[in-house]
A protein has these predicted regions:
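A general structural motif
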Residues: 40-45, 65-70, 113-122
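N-terminal small/polar loop signature for handling phosphorylated ligands or for N-terminal nucleophile
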Residues: 49-105
Length: 168
């Protein structure tokens, strides 16, 4: 009604970006589950899903994957067809930090790995074919700081804006 009252016939519209989320780590248990010894509830996936939805995207939560190359590779396949792929955990330099290695086998081209900030230093960015990829650290605070600083502006571009505000 408002557009018609202003005699505006054409309005730009953009589809919501579909963003796949994969949480990784043998230590993670899905919310509602019972953590065993040395396990924690995986909160990054639900937090990112809410963040993505609040910022105009459609969250595709792929759940939790263990630190297993075969499983991680098959989960990466499920992200294909999305507009963006985000993982949490597995991007630092520990023995179980295998995201970069596994996703390179799935076609990941790394644009950069590591940023000069804390929290969030081991952030990974690249592309799997035309799909952008962000690998966030597993720490929940690091994940959400990286989402605000890196994912939110990327989502704005995917939503068609030509003006991306500095998130900080």
């Amino acid at each position: 009604g408002l557009a018609a009252a202003m005699n505006v016939v054409d309005l730009p519209v953009h589809a919501k970006p579909r963003i796949a989320i994969l949480s990784t780590g043998n230590e993670l248990v899905a919310p509602g589950g019972t953590p065993g010894q040395s396990q924690i509830i995986g909160s990054n996936g639900p937090a990112l899903a809410a963040f993505i939805t609040d910022n105009g995207g459609e969250a595709i939560d792929l759940g939790i994957a263990p630190d297993d190359p075969k499983t991680l590779g098959s989960m990466a396949e499920k992200a294909k067809g999305c507009d963006f792929f985000v993982t949490t955990g597995g991007v630092s330099v520990g023995d179980h930090d295998i995201i970069q290695e596994v996703l390179k086998q799935a076609g990941l081209e790394v644009n950069f790995w590591g940023v000069a900030m804390r929290p969030g230093k081991p952030l990974l960015f690249g592309h799997i074919g035309p799909m952008p990829f962000l690998g966030f650290p597993g720490n929940p605070v690091s994940t959400m700081v990286c989402a605000v600083i890196f994912l939110k502006p990327a989502m704005a571009v995917l939503c068609g804006t030509d003006k991306v505000a500095n998130p900080v």
